[in-house]
Every structure is written in structure tokens, then in C-alpha cells.
UniProtKB/Swiss-Prot annotation:
Entry binding sites for Mn(2+) 1: 258, 338, 383, 422
Keywords, alphabetical: Dipeptidase, Hydrolase, Manganese, Metal-binding, Metalloprotease, Protease
This protein's name: Xaa-Pro dipeptidase 1
Domain of life, source organism: Bacteria
Cofactor(s), by name: Mn(2+)
Species the sequence originates in: Idiomarina loihiensis (strain ATCC BAA-735 / DSM 15497 / L2-TR)
């Protein structure tokens, strides 16, 4: 758990708001108890080693310490939430220390000596109780019948998008930490470092290891910048460094930052393309307001990308035809963005209401997973990109639209891989708060980039 002391004055109201939501759920679903299981360690196959522990995100919403296996949050109507902690002696492993943690004051705390001992804190009759967690076998052994019921999950997932002040503060701190990593990785790149060495610089600057961050670091140089999730960093430095795309974050009390930046080794046309994407990012953020449907933003992104593809001479037809024929999806094959919070791709992104009514993506954009209408106090990423992805380009070269592409021009940019710019945005009623542009990263970009 990475946090500063100024978070904790915000925590009581956060718990109060979560409890208020839960009270509505208890009445609606006729529940007397919801037991949220943090999870438990999992062994490697045929081994005595464990995978890194990842807590149930529903547990993380209540508990800021994310490294608590076999812990529980028990919710009851009109009752202070109970935090159950496993307190058995363990000389094999280091366990998280909660001594003196100020946020514990918001809970009634119980200690159990073994994972099985949770049974004594649960009612015998569980017909009006629900289990939320990954371990179905644990729930069944404890006698739960309502295991991850859809009405409960849909309710919590829908409301997860509306952030409390505490949650926004966590996301803000995570952005500042991640920004330090991005600056360190960029410095290493400009000094000729490999992808792997840039990764090491990133981790050193953020003080967060690979098992602490919300998702695997993506650091791709040259052609590797065209791989959307390049998770195998090259340990050998390239003899001809051209570009680097970094998509990496940080975590504070379970809340994620998710930032992408792209760098050019030289001041050239590729850097101009980066600058064009940066302007598109800011323009789209300016259009993201309460009442706007996210698919409309996604469509606008493709219109802007089409303009850039035409302006840079990659495609010769009109922007309208590019979109109609699906050419822009070759260069931008992913969604414009997603909700951000306890999960990098946070849940509830395609729900119309708390009952879970789905909102389908628009025709031709099936990869768009965020289809909700934007509302105040929601947090989204905005991450347009232009990529030169060999399999997609090959498919385009074999299509009826191949004559519309300036293949010589495309070949000039393929060695750079691609470009992605990604910011984290809090939406308010009258304004947007760009958490990423308030960090040290913004000043660094302006210092090292000619076109910033």
C-alpha cells in the first residue's frame, strides 16, 4: 500500500458512501449480510511456490491494504462494517502490518487464527446472505447459496464508476507516482537504454515492483511500439533507437494510474505525428462532458485519426470514406478509453443501469468495451493511437482498398512502431480534471519535445 497521510481524513466519508450504497442493496435484494472475501494464495502447478496475491477488487473498495489474503469485509444493514484479519503466526512469509493504521477506526475488527475460523463469524442460516469472491469452493464449504449473485455484482459494478473524494485522491497520487516512472524511463531511452533497462529505471523511480503495479509495464522500442501489449522487454539495446512507447502505471491503496507516452529519439516527422496525437487527446478530453455517450467520443476519435492519416499522406481518400470502409480501424484497432479505478479496465463500463442492462458497442467498433454515458465524478482514460501493425497492414494490402494507401509512406513509419498518448481524466459537472497533465511528466514533455 502506497499512500500519504492526507488520504485518511477523506476515508471516513468514503466508507459512509459505500455503506449508504450497501443499505440500498440490502433492501432491494432482501439481504441481511454480504461477505466479501479478499481471496487466498494460489500455488503454481506441481510446485510449492505461490502466484503473486491479487485481492478481490470488491474487497479493495473497502480496505486500502491490498496484501491481505484470507481476509474479509462483512457488511450488515445499519451496522458498522467488520474487517476480519487472519492473524496466525507465520515465520515463512512477510505479512502486511496494520499497526497504527488510522483507517482501521472505520471498522469493527475481528481476528481469526485460521482461514476456516471465519465460519464462527457468519450466521448458520445463509439464505439471506451473499458471498462475493473468487473462491467458489470456499463459499460452498461455508454454506453460501448466493455466490456472486448477478443483481449484487451489477449493483456494485454500476456504482463503482462514481468516485468518492478519497478515491479521486488515490488516483491523483497514483498519477504522480507513475509520472516519475515515465520521466525516468524516457531519460534512459534518450541515453540509449534497452527496453529492459528502461523498465528498471521506471520501477526504481516509482518504488513499485512488477507485482505491485496494477498491470504489466508495456515498454516497446522501434517496431515493438506497434505491439499493443508488449510485455516481453528486450534486454539488448538497439543499435538504432528511433522510438519508444511506454504504457505503465502505479497503484495507491488499490487504485490505478494508467498512462501512455511516446518518445522520438530525433526531431523528425515521427515527432510531429506524436504531437498530432497529443492534440487529438486534448481535444477529445475537452469534448468529454456529462451527458456525452462514450461511443460518440470513440467515433469522434476515428474522425480525428482519419484527418491525421490524410494530412500525413498515409491514406489518399476522404476521412469519411476511411471511416466507412474501416480503414481507420487498421491504424487504431482498440477502444478510445475505459473507466479507471480499482481495476485498470474498471467494471460497469457497458451497463445502462444498476440492474446490469447491457449497452452494445456501435456497429464496426466491436472492440469498444466502454459504452456508458459520461456522468460527473467518473474517471476515464483517453488514449487515441496510430500504429503500423504488420498483420493488420497485410490484411489491408490484400483488400479492395489497397490502392488508397501510400505504402511507401507507411513503410517509412513502420520502423517507429506507433504512437499512443493516454491521460487519466476526472469528469465533473462544469469541468474536467486531467490528473496526468498535473504531474512532473507534463513539464518534462515540454522540455524535451520540440513540438510540445
Amino acid at each position: 500500500m502506497t499512500a500519504t497521510a492526507d488520504l485518511w481524513p477523506l476515508f471516513p466519508d468514503h466508507i459512509k458512501q459505500l455503506q449508504t450504497r450497501a443499505e440500498r442493496l440490502f433492501k432491494r435484494e432482501n439481504l441481511d449480510l454480504v461477505a466479501i472475501h479478499s481471496g487466498q494464495q494460489k500455488r503454481w502447478f506441481l510446485d510449492d511456490m505461490n502466484y503473486p496475491f491479487r485481492a478481490n477488487p470488491h474487497f479493495k473498495a473497502w480496505c486500502p491494504e491490498t496484501q491481505l489474503a484470507n481476509a474479509w469485509v462483512i457488511l450488515k444493514p445499519n451496522t458498522r462494517p467488520t474487517l476480519v484479519l487472519l492473524s496466525s503466526p507465520d515465520f515463512w512469509h512477510t505479512t502486511a502490518s496494520l499497526e497504527g493504521a488510522p483507517w482501521l477506526e472505520e471498522f469493527h475488527v475481528e481476528h481469526i487464527s485460521s482461514p476456516e475460523a471465519i465460519e464462527k463469524l457468519l450466521p448458520y442460516d445463509k439464505k439471506s446472505a451473499a458471498y462475493l469472491g473468487e473462491h467458489i469452493e470456499v463459499a460452498k464449504a461455508l454454506g453460501f447459496e448466493n455466490i456472486n449473485p448477478d443483481p449484487v455484482l451489477h449493483f456494485f459494478h454500476y456504482h463503482r464508476l462514481f468516485k468518492t473524494d478519497y478515491e479521486i485522491a488515490c488516483l491523483t497520487q497514483a498519477n504522480h507516482i507513475a509520472a516519475e516512472g515515465h520521466v525516468a524511463a524516457a531519460d534512459a531511452f534518450f541515453n540509449g537504454a534497452s527496453e529492459f533497462d528502461c523498465l528498471l529505471k521506471y520501477m526504481a523511480a516509482t518504488r513499485q515492483g512488477q507485482n505491485e503495479v496494477p498491470y504489466n509495464h508495456i515498454i516497446g522500442q522501434n517496431e515493438n511500439a506497434s505491439v499493443l501489449h508488449h510485455w516481453m522487454p528486450d534486454k539488448k539495446a538497439s543499435g538504432s533507437l528511433k522510438s519508444m512507447l511506454v504504457d505503465a502505471g502505479a497503484e495507491v491503496c488499490g487504485y490505478a494510474a494508467d498512462i501512455s507516452r511516446t518518445w522520438s529519439k530525433q526531431h523528425n516527422e515521427y515527432e510531429e505525428l506524436i504531437a498530432a496525437l497529443d492534440q487529438i487527446t486534448l481535444a477529445l478530453i475537452d469534448k468529454m462532458k456529462p451527458g456525452v455517450e462514450f461511443p460518440a467520443l470513440h467515433q469522434l476519435a476515428h474522425e480525428q485519426i482519419a484527418n491525421v492519416l490524410f494530412a500525413f499522406g498515409f491514406v489518399s481518400c476522404s476521412p469519411e470514406q476511411m471511416i466507412e470502409d474501416g480503414i481507420t480501424t487498421v491504424f487504431l484497432p482498440h477502444g478510445l478509453g475505459h473507466p479507471l479505478g480499482l481495476q485498470v479496465h474498471d467494471v460497469g463500463a457497458a451497463q445502462a443501469d444498476e440492474r446490469g442492462t447491457p449497452i452494445a458497442p456501435p456497429s464496426g467498433h466491436l472492440t469498444l468495451k466502454t459504452t456508458r454515458t459520461v456522468e460527473p465524478r467518473q474517471v476515464y482514460t483517453i488514449e487515441p493511437g496510430i500504429y503500423f501493425i504488420e498483420p493488420l497492414l497485410q490484411k489491408l494490402a490484400n483488400s479492395r482498398n489497397k490502392h488508397l494507401i501510400n505504402w511507401r509512406r507507411v513503410d517509412e513509419f513502420k520502423p517507429f512502431g506507433g504512437v499512443r498518448i493516454e491521460d487519466n481524466i476526472v469528469v465533473y459537472r462544469e469541468r474536467n480534471d486531467n490528473l496526468t497533465r498535473q504531474t512532473a511528466l507534463d513539464a518534462y514533455v515540454k522540455k524535451v519535445t520540440r513540438l510540445a
